[in-house]
Every structure is written in C-alpha cells, then in structure tokens.
C-alpha cells in the first residue's frame, strides 16, 4: 500500500473496517437467533376437579356441563389419558409436583403436616435458570412459599366467599368470590410482567371445586333444570373391599345436609341444617347472603314438600351434589378463558407452555362416593392438558403411564435447565414434542396413601398399576389385598386377588411392586401401624361431628368402624 496515495489508503481502510463490522454484527445477530427463546410457563391448577367434569375427556356428565375454555388447551395441545397422582390428597400432591419426589422423600405425607420449604423445588430451579416466579391462590402446604418472587396465598383451604389471603406475612380479607379473585391476581401479575425479557413461571391455583362446592352468585341456578346421570355403581355394596365398606365418604350417608347439600332446617327457613363449619356462610356479606337465599330457598322448599325417603332421597342428594359441584366448575372455566384470551391478545401464546391440571381425581358418585383418597381410578387419575404451540402438535393424546411426579422434570427440560438426579420423575417432553408412543416410558406406577385416621377414614394403602392391572394393599387397622383387571372390570367392582385364573399375573404384580418400592427407596418406616385407641378415637370424633345426621341413617354400625359402635356414642 506504499505506492497508493494517502486518500485512497484511507478509503480502503474505511471499507475494510466497515466490512469487518458488518461481518461481526451479522455473526452476532445469527448467534442471537440461534439461541432458543425459553418458554414461559402458566400453570393453572384446581382442587378436586374430576376428569368426568372436563368436557375434553368426553364423560356424559361434562356433555351436560361443558368446559369450553379448558377444552381449548386440549384442542390446541395435548390431552393425557393415563396421568395419575402418587398420593390422592391435596397437600401431598402439591408437594410432589414441586419436588418431583414421592411423599416419603419430600416429607409431606398427609394434610396437616408442614412442608419443608428449604428443600430444592421447581420454582427454585427455575429461578436459578433465570426465570421470574409467582404463585397465587391455594398453597395448602402450611408455612410460607419459598422460591417465588411474588406470591399471595389463601389461608389453609381457603373460603369461597370473601377469602383471607396471606402476603409477606400479612393476612387480608378480600371481598368477592375466590375463583374470580385468584384469576384476577394472576392476570394482574401477567400484565405487569409479560413484557419482561426474563421468562416466567406463573402458578394460578384455585380452591374450586373443593368441598363444599359453593358456586359463584351468578351460577347459583345454573344447572337447576339439568338432570345429571348418576353412575351405575352409585348403590354398590362394596363386596370384596373392606376398606370401601368402612369409609366415611358416601354421598347419601356422610354428606352434611347444611354444609354440603345447602339444605335448610325446614320449609320457609333460610337457616341451614347440620353445618359444623359455619365460617363458609358466616363470612358472606348481607348482600351476598340475600342473593344466595333467594336462589336456594325455592329449591329447598320444594325438597321439604317432596318428603323423599330411601332411594329417592339418596338420588336427590346425588343430584344436588352434582348441580353444585358442576356450577362451581363454571367459574373456573371462565377464569381459564380470561387467561387464555390475555395471552392470545398480547402475542404470548407461541412461547408459553399452558398447563391445566388438578391435585388428584375426584368421585362424582362412582361407588356412591364423593372426595378422593382411594387408589381406584376416579381418585387416582389426574386430568392433565398441556399446550405449547411452538413445539407440541395440536390435538394429540398421550397414553403413557405418567404421574404428577413427572411435572417438574418436564418443565425443567423445556426451560433448558438440568434435571436434578434426586428427582424421581421423568421428563414427558419427548411424549409431547415427538408424539412418542409411551410404551417404553413407564410400565407401572407406584402409589401410597397415608392419611388415616383422618377425614373420611380411608385406610392407608399402597399399590401398583400397570396398563391393564392394579394391585393394592390396605393396611393399618385392616390387612387386605385387592386386585383388578381394568380391561375386564374398568369400574373395579370384582376383587380378583387370589383368583386362580390370575395367579401368574398376581405374582408378577407383587414382583413389580417390590421392585418399585426398592427403586423409590421405600423403607419399613412407611408401614407403621396407628395405635388402635387413636383409630377408635377418630371414629368417635367423626360420629360427634356428624351430629344429628348420624341418627337419621341406617347402617350406623357399618359406618363407624369394624362392626363395633364406638364407646360413648349412642
């Protein structure tokens, strides 16, 4: 360049520098484009929402009470047909979702215990990976949430009307309906944080449709004119299942007439019949209670005029239960629609994983039951819908044996974070993204329920479920095995344990059960028995809690324990 005039040398140097800048900048832009955008996660969870009450699952009940907004997630994403919980009760299921570990390892086996918030959890791992985290609604693990940037939680179970919330240690009563309040909390947080460069985890967790199924004021008469079909097993005798015979969660025997069925003491009265927990109604404002009474008084007066007895009374109770339960679901579906609409209207759908699930299954009259707890299908199965347009094909169905144990590993993999070795679940990402068949995902699931003696007096039990068979052992104050062929007996009414036609299958199931207990590090400590006096005392306490209702029921001895009437109870 010595012979080139200085003017030209400067021009050439400028051109070379410009080309170098363009090249470097282009390479930087290409690198930025190659870095995948990590998805947001909107996790919506209800409490006790049965698959039978989600119309995407096609149950006859849901056809009469559809959930069009929840169904949008299934239509635009994946529906899980064989997703199960590890322990069918509120708090323990939530602990499993947070930790990816079975109850005996995360330390939260039963409602009423205190969750060890210091242990590693999904929100903590996501925060470490650069996510914002927020939780609104039902926590039910006692203590304050850890790992969340923002949170505002219901006190304990929460109340439907004018619920109390805890935020940063302060308790505040908020006027309104719990489902609407929690939905709006989630939406408000979205509006403030959706524009952030950081991805986020937002957990919107509802009380509904948990007992005692109080619909929003706008839905009090929603299904009054609808006659819902009761299950074929509504009046089953529970032959071959001692645990089913001794439970306290039969609709027509064990529901409280005031608290659960909202019945008045007599025609023309607005005073409730037996209602051991008055706070659910006492906290309503005068205006709310007036609208409530105007809706229920005509229905209750008609009931008193009918003077129903026996089977007709039992069927009426089933109808009232379903009408209230499904009307309570309606506000949840509306709330889901609001969140989906916001995400869509603000261009957030493509990069957001949307999850709809519940903490476990629930009985809607099957075997005559309400509530959950048992390892039978209605209680064991957890509805699960996941949408992520960027990666999950619309309208797919997943038939692998999955569990709430798998939620945390799945979200971590989608977020590009490492899945900790201590998590016992497996990522479901391949099932979702590549529509994998799931045959090799898991050949059996393990289940263990501990909460006895407690509400509804469902015995402690553990078991294994494969694609076709189920083996369960009820223990503590009884010792009974149950086994079912789900292909031949999907309603689980014929206990085939020790049936000679199934000897080989039974042996294989025992081997599988032993193997899973070894795999999941289950020790003898998990099978300790409750002192008999504690069990008897619990039966006595629940007899007292039932109060006047007890004296109206036949079969009192069967209900309150092992063929013996508890002491001091007449």
Map each language-model feature to its residues.
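Residues forming the ATP-binding cleft of Hanks-type serine/threonine protein kinase domains
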Residues: 487
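Formylglycine-dependent sulfatase
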Residues: 2-9, 16, 20, 24-475, ...
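A contiguous, mid-protein "functional segment" used to position or interact
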Residues: 500-539
């Amino acid at each position: 360049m010595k012979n080139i005039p200085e003017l030209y040398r400067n021009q050439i140097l400028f051109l070379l520098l410009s080309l170098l800048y363009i090249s470097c900048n282009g390479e930087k832009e290409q690198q930025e484009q190659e870095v995948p955008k990590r998805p947001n996660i909107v996790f919506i969870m209800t409490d006790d929402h049965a698959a039978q009450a989600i119309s995407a699952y096609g149950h006859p009940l849901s056809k009469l009470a559809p959930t069009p907004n929840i169904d949008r997630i299934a239509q635009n994403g994946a529906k899980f047909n064989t997703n199960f919980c590890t322990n069918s009760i509120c708090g323990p299921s939530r602990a499993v979702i947070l930790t990816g570990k079975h109850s005996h390892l995360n330390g939260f086996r039963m409602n009423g215990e205190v969750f060890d918030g210091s242990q590693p959890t999904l929100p903590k791992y996501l925060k470490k990976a650069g996510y914002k985290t927020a939780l609104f609604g039902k926590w039910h693990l006692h203590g304050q949430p850890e790992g969340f940037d923002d949170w505002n939680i219901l006190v304990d179970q929460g109340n439907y009307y004018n619920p109390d919330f805890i935020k940063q240690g302060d308790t505040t009563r908020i006027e309104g309906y719990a489902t609407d309040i929690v939905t709006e909390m989630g939406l408000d947080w979205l509006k403030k944080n959706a524009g952030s460069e950081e991805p986020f985890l937002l957990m919107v967790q509802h009380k509904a449709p948990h007992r005692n199924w109080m619909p929003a004021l706008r839905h009090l008469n929603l299904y009054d004119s609808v006659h819902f079909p009761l299950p074929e097993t509504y009046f089953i005798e529970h032959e071959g299942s001692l645990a089913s015979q001794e439970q306290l969660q039969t609709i027509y025997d064990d529901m409280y007439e005031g608290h659960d069925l909202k019945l008045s003491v007599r025609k023309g009265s607005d005073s409730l019949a037996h209602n051991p927990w008055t706070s659910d109604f006492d906290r309503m404002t005068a205006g709310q209670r007036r609208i409530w009474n105007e809706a229920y008084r005509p229905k209750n007066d008609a009931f008193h005029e009918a003077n129903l007895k026996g089977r007709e009374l039992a069927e009426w109770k089933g109808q009232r239960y379903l009408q209230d339960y499904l009307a309570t679901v309606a506000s949840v579906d509306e709330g889901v629609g609001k969140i989906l609409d916001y995400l869509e209207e603000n261009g957030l759908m493509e990069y957001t994983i949307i999850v709809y699930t519940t903490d476990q299954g629930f009985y809607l009259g099957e075997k005559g039951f309400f509530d959950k707890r048992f390892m039978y299908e209605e209680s064991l199965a957890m509805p699960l819908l996941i949408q992520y347009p960027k990666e999950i094909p619309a309208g797919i169905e997943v038939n692998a044996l999955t569990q709430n144990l798998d939620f945390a590993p799945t979200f971590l993999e989608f977020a590009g974070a490492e899945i900790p070795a201590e998590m016992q679940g497996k990522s479901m990402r391949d099932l979702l993204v590549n529509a994998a068949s799931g045959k090799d995902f898991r050949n059996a699931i393990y289940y263990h329920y501990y909460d006895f003696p407690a509400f509804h007096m469902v015995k402690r039990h553990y078991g294994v479920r494969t694609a076709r068979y189920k083996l369960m052992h009820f223990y503590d104050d009884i010792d009974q095995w149950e086994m079912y062929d789900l292909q031949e007996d999907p309603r689980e009414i014929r206990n085939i344990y020790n049936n000679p036609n199934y000897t080989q299958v039974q042996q294989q199931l025992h081997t599988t059960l032993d193997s899973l207990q070894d795999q999941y590090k289950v020790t003898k400590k998990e099978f300790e028995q409750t002192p008999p006096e504690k069990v008897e005392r619990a039966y006595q306490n629940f007899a007292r809690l039932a109060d006047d209702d007890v004296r109206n029921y036949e079969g009192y001895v069967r209900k309150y324990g092992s063929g013996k009437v508890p002491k001091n109870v007449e």
